Amino acid sequence: MTITASNTLEFKWTSPRSSRSSFRTTTDAEQKISIDMSNTYCDQVLGPLYSYMMVLGLNHTHSSARNTMFKWPLTIYNYLTLAILTAATIRRISQIKQKSATNEEKDAAFHVLNPTFVLTLCHALLMFSGLAAGFLLLKLQKQREKMYHVLDQGLGRNRNEEHDSHHFKLNKLFISISFSFAAALSFVQIATKMRYLDLPDTPDLINRKIYFVILEGYVIFIASSCISLVAILFFQLCRILQFSIGQLIEEMVPKEKEECPLPEQSLQQIHDVQIHYQEISNAKLYIEQNFSFSLFYTYGCCIPLTCLLGYIAFRNGIQADMAETFSVAIWLTNTMLALMLFSIPAFMIAEEGDKLLTASFKMYHETLCEERDLLVLSQMSFLSFQMHATKLTLTAGNFFMMNRKIMISLFSAIFTYFLILVQFDAEKERAGECNNQSRVLIVQPPV
């Protein structure tokens, strides 16, 4: 991955052997100091993510710019961005119970939750999630050697130019989508503060001066981008892992194979499969260690966000114009997009893991030739036991397994909580009408 003079990203593929051989020439002491990521799997395939992080002030330590004269200015920019995001998050959380002076009439029309509270809570959740995502990205940068070993030294040996180029283009597409949604959320907030949109307002972060309003929009842009970057990184790591599982299945059950190979050939095949499976298991463990809590937090955060935004859209849907409806739709779409980026890849890994178990049974059956060596059968039995004991399934904070059943439970919970909010609102409205009727003094005419 290089940046040309026209500021466009260009993909240049290098074979896995070149990157692995160059890595072996370095000493252990040099590994601890720095690793040249210029021709590695991480730097090339995930290059668009790192470039976008540099622009946002979340510069990845793999970047070649950190070895130039811009090292210290970029470092200051990075920490300044995190400091602004942290201060804005604390400020917004402290404003959750505050009321906006411009929304008294709109808030009074809502019997359960007023729009100011809902949108302030949504902003607080967005900023806090973005702050947590920013620190997670910082943690992953410190563990760049671990990612290097997992992707380049392990799964990278099964890559090919077409697959890498596809991942590279997909990353560019995801970055464009992330930028578009982050810019849209920022624009909606600035336009609301400037009274161009008649949306429920939130308490001012500082005041309504133009530069503070722009700062508030910038914070929302950074927070949304951080969340998207973590989701995209998780999605791509899972895609790489899924591709490697597919390669392992083809290695276990090749299309063209001898009817009854020699015991030495079978032992070598089993040995190669064991090494490849261990590399995949290490990659899965790396992903789970770094993203398990993020999966759990995403489900815990997206469910209330979707319910609250859906309630506001339902209550304000008749009176709202097209711009207001579109703004709420942007919030909902952005929330569901982050949820899908965290969910679908985890489901795909679980399904590929089930295919791997099926392939292990088929591979075991193909070893049952006449006069089969007992050592081959024992090694194959151990491999099958290893695959069944360490299933390739991700967990969300070790609370539940990530599979398609969770998605059904998710939508069921969102729909249930949404109906509860609507029911409470209808009961409050009915109770308010009864109170108004009881206060009317009925004077009967004299007989």
From Swiss-Prot:
Extracellular compartment spans: 1-69, 138-171, 233-292, 350-405
Membrane association type: Multi-pass membrane protein
This protein's UniProt keywords: Membrane, Receptor, Transmembrane, Transmembrane helix
One GO cellular component term: neuronal cell body
Tissues expressing this chain: Expressed in I2 pharyngeal neurons.
Similarity comment text for this entry: Belongs to the insect chemoreceptor superfamily. Gustatory receptor (GR) family.
Protein name according to UniProt: Gustatory receptor family protein 3
Classification lineage: Eukaryota, Metazoa, Ecdysozoa, Nematoda, Chromadorea
Gene that produces this protein: gur-3
